[in-house]
């Protein structure tokens, strides 16, 4: 499955920003220059959500293929960042239903999402759920240095202090080898054991993809994002919040032109020409 023309534009926008980031070595300067090139300098005010961490947003309507766009964004992001021993992706989703759907698609080697990532990373890809990570199932220091590790996780299983969240903070003998290999963390998580899953992910310095990111703007959500110790944050949403650093917009008309969505035809009777003109301006 190839990218639609509007999806190609999103990836092109990302690629241009990454080029500017490498030239300027500044998240904010690259963002400002990007929108200056688009003749829209007023859009170039960068919101420093996590200091020192690039944070971008794709604004794509529901049904626009956000997940497939994100799959195509992983390789360009890693290519633009400094080389590291490990390549890890935390793919955050807002609900159990989306978690199941996303994990199933990314684990299926015949699915276009997984096929794209496999092509970009030479088939050396492993996709994990939280339980598989907690169990250390094919998740060890050797594996993560030889593959792209994609961890599909829900906000609620790492946000707050609930029973399910605490599992990620607790001592975990299944992951003890990581603590030996990775050593003391540079960014230790408060109240997390050095063998805890959350702390291990933190030390892998992952790319974090936030699906439906408008649900992840509370203080607890931002604390969660910081604890992941991301190298880059990519937000996906149809309804971005004001602090989002939107790098590419897709509107419903572009989806309609690509036959991705059918827009309804709504007809109203108006009593005068002036009312018609007023409604047209409002629309």
Regions found by a protein language model. Name each.
Residues 1-283:
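RecA-like P-loop NTPase motor core of helicase/translocase proteins
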């Amino acid at each position: 499955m190839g990218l639609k023309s509007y999806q190609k534009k999103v990836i092109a926008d990302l690629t241009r920003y990454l080029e500017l980031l490498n030239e300027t070595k500044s998240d904010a300067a690259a963002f400002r220059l990007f929108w200056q090139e688009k003749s829209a300098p007023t859009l170039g005010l960068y919101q420093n959500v996590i200091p020192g961490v690039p944070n971008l947003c794709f604004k794509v309507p529901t049904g626009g293929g956000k997940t497939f766009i994100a799959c195509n964004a992983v390789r360009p992001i890693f290519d633009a960042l400094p080389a590291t021993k490990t390549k890890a992706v935390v793919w955050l989703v807002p609900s159990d239903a989306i978690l199941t759907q996303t994990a199933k698609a990314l684990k299926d080697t015949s699915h276009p999402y997984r096929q794209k990532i496999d092509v970009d990373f030479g088939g050396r890809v492993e996709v994990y759920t939280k339980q598989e990570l907690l169990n250390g199932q094919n998740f060890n220091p050797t594996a993560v240095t030889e593959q792209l590790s994609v961890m599909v996780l829900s906000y609620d299983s790492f946000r707050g202090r609930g029973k399910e969240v605490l599992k990620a903070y607790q001592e975990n003998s299944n992951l003890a080898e990581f603590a030996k290999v990775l050593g003391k963390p540079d960014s230790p998580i408060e109240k997390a054991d050095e063998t805890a899953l959350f702390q291990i992910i933190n030390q892998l310095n992952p790319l974090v993809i936030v699906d439906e990111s408008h649900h992840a703007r509370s203080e607890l959500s931002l604390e969660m994002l910081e604890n992941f110790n991301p190298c880059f944050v990519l937000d996906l949403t149809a309804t971005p919040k004001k602090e989002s650093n939107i790098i590419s917009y897709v509107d419903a008309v572009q989806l309609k032109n690509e036959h991705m969505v059918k827009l309804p035809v709504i007809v109203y009777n108006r009593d005068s020409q002036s009312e018609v003109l007023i409604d047209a301006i409002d629309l």
